[in-house]
């Protein structure tokens, strides 16, 4: 377990009232939620092998993600209240349970803190060889959008995991359309891998910026012109050494300059 003791758990949940004599510690109440949250982290964000090799500072991000996710899951099942001093547990008649609205607000705050930590950790993990070869690393490496910041670019108040999951299929669809019809699958795959490996060059970064900008505009339902897509092709053509895969791709054939040859056998032959 990433979070092993009640003391460690309480480091991430401020201002929790002390348990009364005979009451189970908060850790015991949340243990099943902590296990689910850690499993979710290992599948979606950071596997256990990668976590074990992280620095203490980066492990703190993973721990915060687990606690905030577990707390979000647990709140409806716990006797928690939100007091002027922070979170509390209803352990005697001196504490009044929080309203439904305040509990909802508390859950929203846990998700906000979780997602901020997810975004920070994902950005840190790029270039980590263990993570790159892991299940979550390979999953993130399939898309040109490899963090949660796109949700903020599309109008959300902060990076949002739920927003990202709600739009990932649309993002992947746009990415595939751009790859097949304009930048080529080979170039798109290479850009995704460069992002994952944290080896993006300045020239690659400019093309990634163009692709990301088009995707953001499409998600925001802003008008995107074909000129934006043509600019990507022209940019690739201007940098053939960097994007050498493009010239031999099926996509490049779509942009070849064909010359019509007037043959005598043709019915429309003219001199």
Map each language-model feature to its residues.
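Conserved short "hinge" loops at termini or chain/domain junctions
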Residues: 1-63, 77-271
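Catalytic-loop motifs flanking and including active-site residues across diverse enzymes
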Residues: 66
């Amino acid at each position: 377990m990433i979070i092993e003791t009640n003391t460690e758990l309480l480091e991430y949940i401020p201002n929790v009232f002390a348990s009364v004599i005979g009451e189970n510690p908060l850790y015991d109440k949340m243990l099943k939620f902590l296990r689910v949250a850690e499993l979710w982290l290992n599948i979606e964000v950071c596997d256990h092998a990668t976590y074990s090799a992280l620095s203490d500072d980066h492990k703190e991000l993973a721990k915060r993600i687990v606690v905030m996710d577990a707390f979000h899951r647990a709140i409806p099942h716990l006797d928690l209240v939100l007091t002027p001093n922070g979170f509390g547990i209803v352990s005697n008649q001196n504490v009044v349970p929080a309203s439904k609205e305040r509990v909802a607000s508390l859950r929203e705050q846990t998700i906000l803190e979780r997602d901020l930590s997810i975004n920070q950790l994902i950005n840190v993990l790029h270039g980590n060889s263990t993570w790159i070869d892991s299940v979550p690393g390979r999953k993130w490496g399939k898309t040109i959008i490899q963090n949660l910041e796109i949700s903020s670019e599309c109008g959300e108040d902060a990076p949002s995991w739920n927003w990202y999951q709600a739009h990932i299929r649309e993002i992947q669809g746009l990415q595939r359309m751009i790859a097949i019809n304009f930048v080529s699958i080979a170039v798109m795959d290479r850009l995704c891998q460069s992002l994952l490996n944290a080896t993006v060059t300045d020239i690659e970064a400019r093309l990634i910026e163009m692709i990301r900008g088009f995707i953001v505009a499409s998600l925001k339902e802003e008008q995107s012109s074909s000129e934006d897509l043509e600019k990507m092709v022209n940019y690739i053509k201007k940098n053939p050494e960097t994007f050498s895969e493009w010239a031999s791709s099926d996509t490049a054939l779509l942009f070849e300059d064909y010359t019509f040859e007037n043959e005598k056998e043709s019915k429309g032959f003219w001199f």
